[in-house]
Design a protein with these regions (language model features):
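Generic beta-sheet signal
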Residues: 23, 162-168
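Short active-site segment of divalent metal-dependent hydrolases/proteases
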Residues: 31, 172-173
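Active-site-proximal alpha-helix that buttresses catalytic centers in soluble enzyme cores
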Residues: 2-11, 15-92
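Phosphate-handling substructures
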Residues: 89-150, 210-215, 223-225
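Glycine-rich phosphate-binding loop signature in dinucleotide/nucleotide-binding domains
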Residues: 64-67, 155-162
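Short beta-strand scaffold positions
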Residues: 73-74, 146, 167-168
Length: 225
């Protein structure tokens, strides 16, 4: 028998106690910077036409999930535009959560990988190898992990036993998956998350977690596949 990833959790399978808070983790749709594979942190590009199509497709998918209690989004425009489509489709209230914002890439904002490496070769190499190293004027992955963990705990506390959509960015979503899996820093570099991809994690009141889905893109429009 196959269980749908968005079906209610069973404690008999997880061994956890209490009703979990289910987080539906949705990455925002395409932007011009993502097309060009540029560092896109606190800059505020809007969705491309394809990005809007991806947002609508994800929203249609999530409209079929029963009982969505809230849609929480990063304050950045690309996430808010994606979240607005989801809120409209699900009828759930929409709220901005600053803790879901993407990494601040500082002086590397808008640069490609090669451009950032050429600008700051030593620092860039160190940044790739250590979570506590930050881009010039930016934020380390360790800092991102701490604020995302605080935000996750607040969401679970405020929505016990509920299903909540979190619309965010690649790094915060990876941090949430890493926390649930109790994984090391390597997961940040070895886990791929597509634009407008859906992941699902149950967080239990006893501190346990169950990852039910990672990087699902089955709802993507045909033009994006």
């Amino acid at each position: 028998m196959t269980t749908r990833p968005d079906a209610p959790a069973s404690a008999a399978w997880t061994g956890q106690t209490g009703a979990p808070t289910r987080l539906l983790l949705l990455r925002h749709g395409q932007t011009a910077l993502s097309v060009e594979r540029r560092y896109s942190g606190h800059g505020d590009p809007e969705l491309t036409p394809l990005g809007r199509e991806q947002a609508r497709a994800a929203a249609a998918r999530l409209a079929g999930v029963p009982g969505v209690a809230a849609v929480l989004t990063s304050p950045l425009r690309r996430a808010r535009q994606t979240a607005e489509a989801v809120a409209a489709a699900t009828g759930a209230p929409l709220a901005v959560r600053d803790g879901l914002i993407e990494t601040d890439f500082g002086a590397w904002e808008g640069l490609t990988f090669a451009e950032a490496r050429e600008r700051d070769p030593g620092l860039h190499a160190a940044w790739l190898g250590a979570e506590d190293v930050a881009p010039p004027g930016g934020e380390s992955f360790a800092d991102v992990g701490r604020r995302v963990a605080v935000e996750r705990a607040a969401v679970v506390r405020e929505h016990p036993g509920a299903t909540v959509v979190l619309v965010s960015h690649v790094t915060p979503i990876k941090m949430l998956l890493r926390e649930a899996l109790q994984g090391g820093p390597g997961i940040l570099y070895r886990l791929h998350l597509d634009l407008a991809a859906l992941s699902i994690v149950d967080f239990y009141p006893d501190g346990g977690a169950s990852v039910r889905l990672v990087n699902d893109t089955g709802h993507h429009p045909v033009s994006a596949r």
